[in-house]
Amino acid sequence: MSILINYFLLVGFCFALASGLFLGLKSIKLI
């Protein structure tokens, strides 16, 4: 059960990191 929770945390962290990088690149292009 704890493995499943850690898996979801890892997926959520990777998704947040990817979306943060995407928004960062968009803001750099706008400047």
Curated annotation (Swiss-Prot):
GO BP term, example: photosynthesis
Assembly and binders: The 4 large subunits of the cytochrome b6-f complex are cytochrome b6, subunit IV (17 kDa polypeptide, PetD), cytochrome f and the Rieske protein, while the 4 small subunits are PetG, PetL, PetM and PetN. The complex functions as a dimer.
Regions that span the bilayer: 3-23
Parts forming coiled coils: none
Family statement: Belongs to the PetL family.
Species per Swiss-Prot/TrEMBL record: Thalassiosira pseudonana (Marine diatom)
Cell location: Plastid, Chloroplast thylakoid membrane
GO molecular function, one term: electron transporter, transferring electrons within cytochrome b6/f complex of photosystem II activity
Domain of life: Eukaryota
Protein name: Cytochrome b6-f complex subunit 6
Gene giving rise to this polypeptide: petL
GO terms for cellular component: chloroplast thylakoid membrane; cytochrome b6f complex
Function: Component of the cytochrome b6-f complex, which mediates electron transfer between photosystem II (PSII) and photosystem I (PSI), cyclic electron flow around PSI, and state transitions. PetL is important for photoautotrophic growth as well as for electron transfer efficiency and stability of the cytochrome b6-f complex.
